[in-house]
Each structure stands twice: as structure tokens, then as C-alpha cells.
């Protein structure tokens, strides 16, 4: 195996390295980065691949364009990873070759058993034939046949032993040798015991009663079995086959030279027979090579499929970890299931039925979905926690962007770990505000304890943060318990969030709280016991009578400062304090991996006492330190909970209730940080090309190691064995059991031609067809020339029909050969009309029709030479029968065609031959001449077989005897067996391609889905940087920011019906319309940051590469302004479809310097900060309904771009004083907007009813001078929540929009009474006075 430094590399890249390396023996090519190939593979459909979907590196350099890949002027390699020795087809790796032989052994064993059964049947039939015909010395012929039958039975039994697996090659050789020595020589017209004597007159040899046709059929069968079944090396098979042919014809030559033929005719006869042997050897070699090519290629493809399956499991695990790190497991699983279903449906939509079928439209059109998918549920008894950093504005005043992001990342990382330990669910951050929930989305009985422990832990964590960072900040925490709506809003950059009036009340609890304490409501206090130090909240005494305090409506509140100490010290606290005394800084100071291991080992040896209910999370490690769960306990944990650590150093999580579920099976290299996941994903992407080019030079044996790893992975997999032993095809028809796969198989050749697929190996469908046509042409020419040569030997002119057939056939063969060469090498150079013709004839039925003609041309050419000489010349008759046997064997060619068609055609040819033997084609005078000639020739022959022959000479069929029927039957039986076996092999090869490609597509889909989720969390260009760095923060000199608020959504929202769920469904539709705008290419430079309640936040100019490509430095501002105008139009269109209510949009626009960065550890959030963001938020909050308000600096730039504004005047902006602002669009009278149109700053009622995270008014801040309130609006503008989910599908502009669909749908909806509203979606909206109209 590989050395430890390379094990990780080999683990992730073994598939591509071991399967895609070139087979050149003089060089080593290793592909480490498979992204480009996988991206191309991901575009393929489920079954829409050809049988040549190989990844081998071969071929020449093509021209640009899609057809350039097809420009390959040299022969491809035999198969992927093939050695350079074509005469011995093997892998270039010993490991792969041995594994291939081992994994293909079941198929080889099964085929050898079939061959033994066939040979035994032949021996039995020949034995019966000799026994039935009463002749002298029958035992001379029956004993060898019966003996070999016993040998076949013995070998058949031997195949079931373990010894056969080690010696099956030698067993095949022995079988063939015994068959050749015991059968074929005995059937020759001479024997070793009776040789010729030198006499003045040649003596007649001993006749064995077997004609030339019978013996030649045996020769053909031996050679076919040698090349196709015995599984010997090609060079050895060729040597044995040629030796056998020479011995066979030598024996026949010695007999013929002494009897019927004389002079030069014997040599012409020998030359003709040599041509026939050339044909059978050519066919055998072709079948041998293609069988080896498909067998090894199938092995490699199935191995790739297994490796891709392993990669698929790893990718799926990585994907789940990435998504679970940013949203609750139950929501993430639902989204992943939805994504998997969409991916599977996409695969089914692109399944490879024929192109004609793909164009068919269903008879029943599905009704389009009017509303977008809406994932939201109502959950009761949920505790909500809001926490704000007191003093954050002062702390960030003198910090750079990078330093500020680092501080927030450190602090929020601690909070993220606290969420995991206290079983809370982090929702988001709003500026320096952090909020989470407990009991949602999975209910918990101890939700209130979880939030209280979370709040106390945050206070302790920030104290430790101040000690380490030398800062002066504190935490103000508020908790409330009630009912929430949880789910996802929008289709782009969405996230898991919670909404309800209780959520807003929890935010109010935080605003009215006290730094260093947890401010809880009376509803939360009901779920707590007396373990905490609790005091009255005294809100009125602290803030006085104000609008903010009035929102409590007399709600009693409490302040919690910590737990009551019932005992001086408990064992749990002692252990915790000892760990805290050691110091987290000392843990971080471990300089090496050994020290880290020692530290971890020391922690494990510390005895962890059982946690008591009174122990809370008092000390929190920094975000980059991982400790055992036993070191941090919380009051919501069961005291008998098992604290065993999960693999990888992570503690198991509880999901439901108080008991911990079984630990999840995690990867050995799992991380808790999404930073590390992104970096891990980047490492899996591969090494750079420059490094991969140096790898072959530095590590010569890397391919051997990866091959060994490849073999180890597939060794224990049952798929390989089941694949070869139980192929997924019908045993009768040989069709695939999957109908879609069968249709794909039938169209694969045509699709390969249509898409100009590159030819890389002999297994390519088009190149395999070229070899088939070339072999057919060769056999046709040899048989035709031999038949014409035979006419010269008998001194008779060839028949005119033979000449006509030869001319027509040779034209067809040459035309087919030219077309095949065009398809393989020059397809991109043909004209459009020619290419359409090629695509037409490459279909399933046209290809079978043309293939049937081509494969039958040799037989047709031989039959065209059947004349009266067939009955008047016994040697001519024998030769023509032998030529027909070769034509029958030719039907083993064209393995891509149906074996049933080829075998039936071969059977027809055999039947026609027998009919011609027994039906006279000549007049009676010719028959009389035949009788006279045969009487003269046979009178001198004395043999046991013909000694009793009657005086009147019989027909050639009578002379040949019934053995021709048996010979043709046995040969046809072998052809049927080989055709079936080769088609199964060909289909298995195609299926291996399909499986490997399907797994590759799934893996790519698995990789794309996390990428899509990451893009919904953070922009793609930011994710790329996070793969190589631990943090991201960047300053932008001129970024554009907008805040768009639906100012009257609070008037529309009510919780009396389904808790307000249907109101948020309407909001989801409107936000979805905004997201659709961002899907347009024109707005690609705009990034959606987040949604805060009914406020939509977006920015532009954050991608520096896009800004550099722009012709104008402020071009992105114009794009953002156009987007804001489109948002106004979308709201107007949406209102036109609403009844009884019109939404009003208010937009604030500003540009300037800002900072973008990513904060968090387990849950990353992409956000923007800066004074520019604060002013953009103020432009919204003090803006005017249905208008866009901009600052003076932004006005100067936009006015130069042709936009007309109204000067509003000087307005007071919190934190900035008096500012000049401008409004768009311009009023008709060019006057200032009347005072009654000005929007008042949002009061706390708007905050509670409509938007989460709104800051208190300026008056409240003045009423509480002792409390340093952070401006939530500023923080809401300073920070952005990234959304984590799958991207919404882009819609074409020509398609009707959701608003138009809702409009059409609304025409059929009548207004009904709210009390009679049903469960239907339209009735629910009608109850809320939200309907659809024109």
C-alpha cells in the first residue's frame, strides 16, 4: 500500500488515477484533477451514453469545437490501461491484470463448462452416428469419441474444484489438445498405421468413411473453440491454430496427391483450402481480441462504478455535514431529499429513450403550480433567546475590517459551540446581536433550561473573551417562551428562521434587559424551577413609563444572574474549575501534533464525574479548541447521560427529549468547522496541473500503488461477482430487464454518431463496427476469389449470376467500409446532409437491416457459384460445402446486432445448403455423366466403407452421407452459443459504461448540491477563498447597498388564523419574485445578503473580478438601482393580483466603502459592515413609501447616469446628524414631497408586528442612559445572514411569471366568508382577504 503521506491522496483519487492513466509503456500519465472530466460527464443523461464511454487517454489533438474531439487519425488503444503488446491483450499493470482474471473467472468458468458440454455432445452424436451406420472397424471411430466424452465429463467435474481456479488456463489447453489428437486426425482420410508404399502404382489408402465436409467442420469447430473459449494467450492460440491447420491440410494433401487429383490441381486445391483457413483464423482472431477488449473494459468500468459508489458515499456524508452545519438536521434532510428527488426526476426526464420518444408530449398536461414551495410549520412551547453585545460600537470604532471580523469570528465561534453543547439551534446574527431557539424544529421538554444555560454561558464566555482580548464588552440577554413559525422564506440565499409576535417579544426582552444578566419573561419562568437566582425585572423602574415599556402590556419579567449554590463545591464543578484553571491558552500553545495528542490523552484520563442538574456551562473554550462533552455540561442534560465521545473527537448530540440517541457514524476526518469542510472539498478537487505533471517524475510507482488500492477496494465488493455471474438481462431475449436501459442501448450507437463522441478504444461502438465491416469485406473477398479460383480448376466459366453478385456486393462492402471510416475518423468533415444520412442509418432498425445484408454477403456470394458442377464434380461439391461452413461462421461477426437475427440467418444458410445437396439443379444428362466419372474413379478404391457400394453411383448427397447434416447441426449449435455469449458480453460492457457514468453523474450532482448550498450561505467567489484560508474579510471602496422594506406588512399580518402561516406564504411569494429578478444574468453582480422580517437587503460591487471586467467603475451601482426599480414594479404587479390590500415598498440606497466578511465556525454567515451600510439602513427607515431615497453622494453619481430625482431636503439621520437626501421617482410638479408623505421612524409596534431585529427608537435610547444599547437597525444593516439551501431554478423570461399565474388563477376565485374557509390554499388566502384577481 501507499505510504502514509500519500494514503489520503490515493483514497480520494484512486479511481481516476487507476482508471484513466495511459497504457503507454514508455511513459506514465497520471490524472490527479478530474474536475473537468467530471463536469463533462455530469452533462450526460442517465442512460444517454454510448458503449465507448471510456476515460482512457488516447487520441490525437482535435480542432476547436465539439467535433474536434473526433479528429483522431491513428488507431486507438485496445482498451483503457492496455499494454503496448497488441498480440497479448493485457493490462499494463500486473495488479489490474490479476484482479481482472480473478473477477472475470466466473464468466470464464461458465463459458468453459458450456464448451465442455458442447464438445461432449458432439462426441456423443458422432459416436451414435458411427454406431448406427453398419461399417467395418466401427470401434476405430467409436472408441476415440467415447473416450473423449469421458474426458469431457472428467474435466466438467474438475471445474467445480478449487484446483481448477488455479489451473484453468492449462486445463483449457489440455482439453483442446486431447480433442485435436483424438478426433480430428482420426477423421482424416489416412491413418498413421497405413502409409503409402513406394510402388509403381499408388495403393489406395484406408477410407475412414468421413467426408471432407465432416472433417473440415471438425477443424472449424476446433479453431473456433480455441479462439473463443479456451482462454489462452493470443500468440499461443494463433500458434496452435496455425499448427493445427497445417497438420490438417498436410494430411489431406498427402491423400489427395495420391488419388483423385493430379498435377497442379492439387496445389490449386491446397491454395483454395489455405484461403478458407485464413478466413476462419481471421474471424477467430477478431472474436478473440474483441472478447478480451470487452471483458477487460467491462471489468474496469464495473470497478470504476464501485469506486464511484465509494466516492458517492463520502460525498454524501460530506454534503450532509455541510448542510447540517448551517441548519437543523430535520430541515436539512428535507431539503436534501427534495434535491435528490429533483435530481432523480431530472435523470428520468433525460432517460435515453429514442429521440422520437423524447419529443412526444403527454396527452394530459399537468397543471402548473401556482404557489412556490413553502416550508413552514408552527411549533408551540419554544424558548427564544436574543443576546446583544453591549459596547460593541465602541470596541469596533478603532478596529480594522480584518481585526473586527476576527473578533466576531472568535466570539460567535464560542457561541456556536455553546449552542451545540446546550442543544440550542442557532438562527442567525444581526450585527452584534445573536439569537437562537430551543425546542425548535424538534420539540424538547427542557427548552427553557437550554436557553437559560445558553444565556449564562454566553455571559461567562464574553467575560473570558474580555480577559483574553483585553476588551470591555458585556452581554445583554433576553429570553421568552411562546409559539413560533419556523421554516424558510424565499428561493435564493435563504436560511432557516423563526417568526411570530413571541419572537419579537423575546427581542424586546433583550432590549429592556441588563448587561451581565438574563432577562426572562413570566412565560419562561413557568418552565423553570428554583435552581436559579431570580429577581424581579423592574422594567418600569429602570426605563420609566414609555412606549417601549407599554409593549409589555403588564407582563412580569425576571432577571437571572446565575444558579443557586446548594453545596460549596460539587465534583462536577471541581473538574470544570480544574480544567478552567489550566487555561485554554495553554491548550492552544501545544506546538506539535505529539503535544496535542498528549493533551487529548491527558483529558481522557481525567475522571469525568456524573453531571448534576445544578451545573451549568460556566467556561467556554475558544472556537478553535475542542474538548470532551464531559468538560462542559448544562442544566438541561440528564444526569445519567453517557458522555462517551464520538469518533473524531466530537460529542454526540441529542435530538429529541433528554436522552442521547446512538452516536452517528462519522467520517474519520470529520470537522466541525465549515471552513475545514470547504478546505477538505478543495483538497479533494485535486492537485494543480503543474504538480500533477511532476508526480510521474517524482513517484514512478504511484500508478502501481493506486492500482493496488483500486484492487483492494473492489476485492470485497459483491457487485463485481454478481455483475458477471448474474447479468441484468433476460435469459431468453437477452434484452435488459430495465426497459429504459434497453431503449438507451438501442439508441446508443446513434447518439454516439450524433454527438461526435471521441474514439478512444477498440470498445467504441463506431470503431467496433468498423472492424466488423472490415472483417466482413475481407471474408467476402477471400471467399469470392476462392470460388472464382475453383471454377478455373474445374475448367468451367463462372456463372453470370456470380459476377453480378460480386460486383454489387463489392460496391456495398466498399461503401460500408468508407462510411465506417468516415464515422470513426472524419465525421466532423462531412457535409450536413451526409451527416443526417449517417444519423439515419445508424438507428436500431436500419442498422440491423444493413448489418443483415453485410453479414449475409459471403454466403450469398458462395451460393451464387452453385451450378451444375455442384452435382457433376464431387471435389467442387466438397469445396463449396466447406465455403458455406465459413460463411456460417461469419455470422458470429457484428456482435452489436441481435444474436437472434444472426443465428436465425445462419440457420437459414445451413438449411439452404442441405436443400441444395438433396435437390437436383442439373438435367438428367449431367447426372449420367456424373455416374460414369464416379464409377471410373471409385472402382480402383477398396475400402471397408465403399466395398459394398452398389454398381450404380449415387448423388453427391448420397456420397457425402448424413454426416453433413450432423456437421452443419453441430456448427450451427456452436454459432448459436457464441452469438449469445458475445451479445451478453457486449451488453455487459455497455451496462458497465452506464453504471460507471451514472455513478459519476450522481457524484457530480452530490458535489454540485453542497456547492449550491454553500452559494446560498456565502457567495461562490468567497467560498473559493475559504478553501485555502481560515477566514475571509475584504474592504470594498465603492459598494452599493439597498434596504427594501414592506412598510405595511405588520397591518397585513395576523396570528388569529394558523398562527400567521398564510400571511408568510404571501410574503414568501413576494420575496420569491424578488429572488427571480436576481436570477437574470443582467443582475449577476448583485448579491442578496439576507431578509430581516419584511426587509430585503442586497448589495453590489462585492465581487472584484466582475468590477474589473466592467467598463465603468460605478456600473454596478446603475445595475443595483435598476434592480431597485424592478422591485417597485414587482410589488405593483403583485398588488394588482391582491384583493383588499396593497403592499407598499420603501427603499433606501447608498454606496461607499464597506467591509465584507464571513463570521462563525460551525454556521458561516456572510455579512457586510460599515458606515455605508448604516446609512443605507437609515435611508430606508426614514424614507418615503413607494420611493427610493438616496444620499447626496449617491445622487451625484446616479444623476450623471440620467436619473432624475426630487430634492427632499435635510433630514435628521441618527448617528450622522443632518443629511441631504433625494427621492426617486421625480414628482410630476418637481415640488418637494408633502410632509404627510414622510415616514415616521418605526416604533416598537412595527418591530413586534412586522420585522425581527428592529432597533428601539431614539426616544427609548434616551430614556435608558445607563444601558448602552446597540442600534439594532445599524447592526441589521451591518450584518447579513447567508441562507443555506438549494438554489431555485431559473425561469425563462418568455414563461409566465408567478404573478401572472396567480392573476389567471384568481379569476376563478370568489370571495367567501372567513368562517366558511376550508382547508384549500385559495380559501385560506381568501379568509385573510388575500385573493388573486386580474
Curated annotation (Swiss-Prot):
Binds 2 magnesium ions per subunit. Is also active with manganese (in vitro). Its EC number is 4.6.1.1. It is found in: Cell membrane; Membrane. It is a multi-pass membrane protein. It is an enzyme of class 4 (lyase). Residues 1-28, 49-71, 338-363, 635-670, 1266-1303 are annotated as: Disordered. GO terms for molecular function: adenylate cyclase activity; ATP binding; metal ion binding. Mg(2+) 1 binds at residues 388, 432. Residues 135-137, 188-207, 251-269, 790-800, 871-873, 924-957 are extracellular. Gene3D superfamilies: Nucleotide cyclase. Pfam families: Guanylate_cyc. Residues 1-113, 159-167, 228-233, 291-768, 822-849, 895-902, 979-1334 are cytoplasmic. One of its GO terms (cellular component) is plasma membrane. Detected in embryonic heart (at protein level). Insensitive to calcium/calmodulin, forskolin and somatostatin. Stimulated by beta-adrenergic receptor activation. Activity is down-regulated by calcium/calcineurin. Glycans are attached at residues 937, 946. ATP binds at residues 388-393, 430-432, 476, 1090, 1167-1169, 1174-1178, 1214. Mg(2+) 2 binds at residues 388-389, 432. Its main location: membrane. Residues 1272-1284, 1292-1303 have a biased composition (Basic and acidic residues). Residues 57-69 have a biased composition (Gly residues). Residues 16-28 have a biased composition (Polar residues). Belongs to the adenylyl cyclase class-4/guanylyl cyclase family. This is Adenylate cyclase type 9. It comes from Gallus gallus (Chicken). The lineage of its organism: Eukaryota, Metazoa, Chordata, Craniata, Vertebrata. The gene is ADCY9.
